[in-house]
Amino acid sequence: MTNTTDGDLLLKNITAQAPFPICFADLEKAVAEKIPAGPFGYIRSGAGGEQTLRNNRSAFEKYSIVPRFLNDVSNVHTSINLFGKTYPTPLLFAPVGMNGMVHEEGELAAVRAAQQLNMPYIQSTVSTYALEDVAEAAPSATKWFQLYWSTNEEIAFSMAARAESAGFEAIVLTVDTVMLGWREEDVRNQFSPLKLGYAKGNYINDPVFMASLPNDSFESYVQGVLQNVFHPTLNWEHVRELKRRTNLPILLKGILHPEDAKLAIVNGVDGIIVSNHGGRQLDGVIGSLDALPSIVSAVKGQIPIILDSGVYRGMDALKALALGADAVAIGRPFIYGLALEGQQGVERVMTNIYDELKVSIALAGTTSIEGLRTITLVKNDGMEVK
């Protein structure tokens, strides 16, 4: 519960001694000026002509709120429950790979921020630091492991088992990376963090992966990762087999079609992340927020729905929650914070997003996530959504 009458959620940013970018555009500008073009372009860009990247933003911008007033909104409640645990906010850290290319402490700094904020942290398969190192860095944080299926399936099962042994509490299987998206910005910059070794953490510490290499050279490792990180054969039988191999809840990340959401339930999946990979895989894809309502309708509350892709501020999170998401995952913004100020930068970015969310909930005329389900949203064409 947060008291919203003290008015300090915005003012604390005005009176702070060290100015920090307050919005996504300011963050992006500051990071562009700080880190090399290769890493910046990798993080900023989308696939192809970046239509999906634009679709994500336009999806949020097409929805407007019709607020209600003369309600007591002095105490805003933002807690949620996921898989039997209660969290003070509906915000999560989305899986973002290769954090070491923007900050030397990479995922270690990010997970410490998540621990401090009590927000679930989803670690990427292609992380700079191994999952065991991340677990040790933030022992009390809620940690989930994002899994890229491997061409050698035993590598995928090995990583899932390691995550379970290290205390991770869920497996997030990404389904939209059957091959690498058409990343034109990386070609322009001649930059591939995979080839530079920024994804080494989980692979070089995996016994099954290392045993599959012809030798222990850097070149052998890079080729091994490139051969295994994409999975064109991934199908529902693999999902069922993963379910048999782990005791952890399994979420599918990358679901955009309601029929796939229904199949996820049929196949025993425990949660869904509505996502288009931040616009980085297939160009021309529906914005994640535009995909959300039909998936909410298909799922009917049977399993949790989390949304990511294009969530840059608290108002974006509010709209996703109002349209039925149970939680919202943040990606690019926290990575920009990491690039600027390490752990402290991550905390500041996520806190600003959360503070804007709290203020916006109150200004919309309600006091809780549940209350957001009752507010009126309209599209820019004037059509009432709910």
UniProtKB/Swiss-Prot annotation:
GO terms for molecular function: (S)-2-hydroxy-acid oxidase activity; FMN binding. The keyword Flavoprotein applies. Keywords: Flavoprotein, FMN, Oxidoreductase. FMN binds at P95, V96, G97, S124, Q146, T174, K253, S275, D308, S309, G310, V311, Y312, R332. Pyruvate binds at Y42, Y148, R183, H277, R280. It is an enzyme of class 1 (oxidoreductase). Disulfide bonds: none annotated. It catalyses: a (2S)-2-hydroxycarboxylate + O2 = a 2-oxocarboxylate + H2O2; (S)-lactate + O2 = pyruvate + H2O2; 2-hydroxyoctanoate + O2 = 2-oxooctanoate + H2O2; mandelate + O2 = phenylglyoxylate + H2O2. The active site is at H277. Its cofactor is FMN. InterPro entries: Aldolase_TIM (IPR013785), Alpha-hydoxy_acid_DH_FMN (IPR012133), FMN-dep_DH (IPR000262), FMN_HAD (IPR037396), FMN_hydac_DH_AS (IPR008259). Binds 1 FMN per subunit. Residues 16-382 form the FMN hydroxy acid dehydrogenase domain. The keyword Oxidoreductase applies. Its EC number is 1.1.3.-, 1.1.3.15. Belongs to the FMN-dependent alpha-hydroxy acid dehydrogenase family. PANTHER family: FMN-DEPENDENT ALPHA-HYDROXY ACID DEHYDROGENASE PB1A11.03, S -2-HYDROXY-ACID OXIDASE-RELATED. Homotetramer. Oxidase that catalyzes the oxidation of a broad range of 2-hydroxyacids in vitro, such as (S)-lactate, 2-hydroxyoctanoate, mandelate, 2-hydroxyoctadecanoate and (S)-2-hydroxyglutarate, to the corresponding 2-oxoacids, with a reduction of O2 to H2O2. May be involved in the utilization of L-lactate as an energy source for growth. This is L-lactate oxidase.
